[in-house]
Each structure stands twice: as structure tokens, then as C-alpha cells.
Design a protein with these regions (language model features):
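Acidic, low-complexity intrinsically disordered regions
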Residues: 1-290
Length: 290
């Protein structure tokens, strides 16, 4: 997957046809159950492949907590953040041939613990995102963000790593803590894989072999994932959700060895303040400060 290119005009047409700006979360995300095409139980592999059109594919997986209080975040992403992230990725050419996958993350006790789209480079990213079921179950108890790590480690095949030894990127986003493990029964039920218990720390290690892992904590650092991915947790307040595109891009830039000026260039004062603080503690071979 991953053909085509993202165009702002395509997003404008989609927003108009779906009346996204004036619609509620329930009106935007109309699915009331998980579609089999996004159910990891029926997905052997998701691929991010090079092509003549995109010879240097870079997979970026973004997993969003869709339980309980996180409904507002799903709305923000579809209305604003997705378009801004894609526009900036393409206009700045920060990442070669980006291919985005979105994941809806819940808890192993939910009806839909994990849903995953294809890796795409065009408006199909948004179209698939809007087909996900925003289940809204659960509350602020620990969630199972590590299910996405398992899927990326076991069920993705990415040319950037296979051909060039470069890692993809994964950002999980939410306001709850991680569970410490996934039982073998849940692995079997969710992925239809051999039943085996995995510690969350083990899954972080597995996924980090092919992906640069980050967790964006929307609970002001109170639910830190640092014990699983030390130096890769970004603390953001709910009021700063609108800056997610800039924060994600800044983290990718840090991995790419960009300078402080590269990262903050072009941002307005408020964005500079938020981005600088949010990623200043990341351990990626350097950090940025105003």
C-alpha cells in the first residue's frame, strides 16, 4: 500500500462532503462495530513498500487511545491534526515518502482492543481513519497501548528497515497508564497468534528493533511510560493537543539529527514554547531548548 500523494485539496473536498467541521465525534465516526478489515485477528501483515512513485518509504504509525475521555482527541485529529501533519510532512519534505497508519487503541477487555488501517500516502489515510469504531468503552484505568507495539513487531513488513536499515516511527497517544503485560489468551483472541504472555517491556524491545517508539502522555506526565521506553515520553496537556503535528514532526527531526533552528524555524511563539518544552527531555542523541 502507500500509493498516491496527499493533497490539501483532497482533504478540503472530504471535509466538505462529510461536513466534518460542523459534525460531532459520533457523526464523523459512524461505525458502531469493528470492521473486519481493521481487525488484527484477520490481518496477516501491513506493508510499507517502496515504489517508483515513493522510492524511500517511511512508515509512521500513530495509535490513539479511543476509550472513555479520549473522544475529544479523535475529533481533534480528524478535524485538524491529520491534515496539518500531512501538509507539513509533504511541504517540508522532512520525511522521505511518508506512509501513515492509524490505530485505535483500547483495552484487552473492550470489544475492539485494537484496530489498524493500512499504511497510506494519500487521502485514503483520512478515509480509513473515519471508518474506525470509536468504541468509547473503559475509563481512565491502564490501557493497552502495547498492543500496537506487538502488531508492529509481528505483523508489519517495511522496506525502509529491510532495504536500508532505517527504522519507522510509532507514536502512541493517550491519558492513561500502560498495563504491564498482555496475557497469552489475549494474544490469541486479538491476533489469532500462538498464546504467549508478553511483558510490556518485552514488547517495547521487540517493536523498537524496527520502529522509533514514542508515547505522548496527555495526563501531564502523571501516567508516564518511561519505565518501558525511557527518554521517549512526551508530556502534553490536553489544551496543547492542537500542537500534536508540530510535536510529532519535532520528534522525528530529533531522530534525524536536525538542529534547534531546524526544528523551531517557522513556528509561531506559542508553538515554539509548547514544542520546545514537550520534546526537550527526549533522549534521541540530543534535545532542544529555546
Amino acid at each position: 500500500m502507500g500509493g498516491g500523494s496527499y493533497k490539501a485539496s483532497d482533504w478540503t473536498k472530504l471535509k466538505t462532503s462529510r461536513k466534518i467541521d460542523s459534525s460531532s465525534v459520533d457523526q464523523i465516526f459512524k461505525s458502531r462495530k469493528m470492521d473486519d478489515k481493521f481487525n488484527p485477528k484477520f490481518i496477516q501483515v501491513r506493508e510499507a513498500r517502496d515504489s517508483e512513485e515513493h522510492p524511500n518509504s517511511t512508515p509512521i504509525a500513530i495509535g490513539v487511545d479511543v476509550t472513555g475521555s479520549m473522544g475529544y482527541l479523535s475529533s481533534e485529529i480528524i478535524k485538524n491534526s491529520l491534515n496539518e501533519l500531512m501538509k507539513k510532512l509533504y511541504s517540508t519534505k522532512l520525511v522521505e515518502d511518508p506512509q501513515l497508519m492509524f490505530a485505535a487503541i483500547g483495552d484487552t477487555t473492550d470489544e475492539a482492543p485494537l484496530q489498524v488501517t493500512q499504511f497510506e500516502s494519500d487521502i485514503r489515510i483520512a478515509e480509513q481513519l473515519m471508518e474506525l469504531w470509536i468504541e468509547g468503552a473503559g475509563g481512565d484505568s491502564p490501557e493497552d497501548y502495547q498492543l500496537l507495539w506487538y502488531f508492529l513487531a509481528k505483523h508489519t513488513d517495511i522496506d525502509c528497515f529491510n532495504k536500508r536499515g532505517k527504522k519507522g516511527f510509532c507514536f502512541t497517544i493517550g491519558d492513561a497508564a500502560f498495563h504491564d503485560s498482555v496475557t497469552g489468551g489475549n494474544i490469541k483472541a486479538i491476533f489469532n497468534d500462538d498464546a504467549k504472555l508478553y511483558r510490556t517491556s518485552e514488547l517495547a524491545k521487540m517493536a523498537s528493533e524496527k520502529y522509533e517508539l514514542f508515547h505522548i502522555d496527555l495526563n501531564a506526565g502523571k501516567m508516564s511510560a518511561s519505565k518501558y521506553i525511557p527518554g521517549r515520553v512526551i508530556s502534553v496537556s490536553p489544551s496543547e493537543v492542537k500542537y500534536l503535528p508540530e510535536i510529532i514532526i519535532a520528534a522525528i527531526q530529533l531522530i534525524s539529527g536536525k538542529t534547534n533552528d531546524d526544528i523551531l524555524n517557522g513556528l509561531d511563539f506559542s508553538a515554539k514554547q509548547v514544542v520546545s518544552r514537550a520534546v526537550s527531555t527526549l533522549n534521541v542523541g540530543g534535545s532542544i531548548k529555546l
